[in-house]
Amino acid sequence: RDLALDIGSYPHRFLTFDRLHILVKGLHLPVPCVQHSIRRVEFDAWLLERSGAPVVQHTVRNIREEEGAYIVDDAFRSRYLIGAGGTRCPVYRTLFRELNPRASELQTVTLEHEIEYDWRRPDCHLWFFDHGLPGYAWYVPKQNGWLNVGIGGMADRLKAGPRSIHDHWSMFTQMLGGRLAKGARYDPAGYSYYLRGRVDVARRGNAFIVGDAAGLATRDMAEGIGPAVRSGLEAAEAILHGKEYRLEDVTGASLGGGLASRLLDWAMT
């Protein structure tokens, strides 16, 4: 809805789930829903192409303000600057880190791998708190023979616990190998980001931070795509129409904010 996406005209992989399989310490809860899976590499490229914006790939090393403009590596100059580079965003690092420090207790760490795999079970599965994991693991089929598996948890609690994120990954993929993804081979990539906490300063002059650069992921499911989209739209409205840049309502809750959301927020943080 936020992206005005017409599913029928989307040209890439798009799979719809009518239920989630939620597993909590052996308890299996099939939950009716309407959820979708896409491949991010396809979806992000399609959104960028749809925007019609010119694209230049460049590794940012230096940002400075000069005469009402932002200068990036003496190669680019702009009146407005939006930091959408995730946790390590150079706009956040240069202009916002001291004004808007992140809370270590809200940091997550994740291991994930998306592979070509001829899956047989078409439903999304989520495992919460297995073996003391302060988070959850997932099995998400993608259309036409792709599969995303991953595991994530709260960084501080993992550091204080007996098992690392890699230990949890090994146990998780071993379980998958006996059930849902026999013979699959993984080479996971790791990344880190922050759940929503206080965001004291998200605009400085004509510079903005959005999405994971601002630390906006939901506190129940640690989901960042929705908050990234909504905060990006808020930044666009501020630039185009002079509206106040407000982030109070962009995060919300992945599960709707009811009892399940509140329990997961409490359990994860």
Name the predicted role of every residue range.
Residues 1-21:
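N-terminal FAD cofactor-binding segment of flavoenzymes
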Residues 18-24, 68-72:
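Short polybasic amphipathic segments
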Residues 236-269:
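Active-site-proximal substrate-binding core of FAD-dependent oxidoreductases
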Residues 191-219, 260-268:
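FAD-binding beta-loop-beta segment adjacent to the flavin cofactor pocket
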Residues 49-185, 194, 198-199, 215-216:
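Predominantly flavin-linked oxidoreductase catalytic cores and closely associated redox partners
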Residues 217-239:
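A conserved FAD-binding loop/helix module that cradles the flavin
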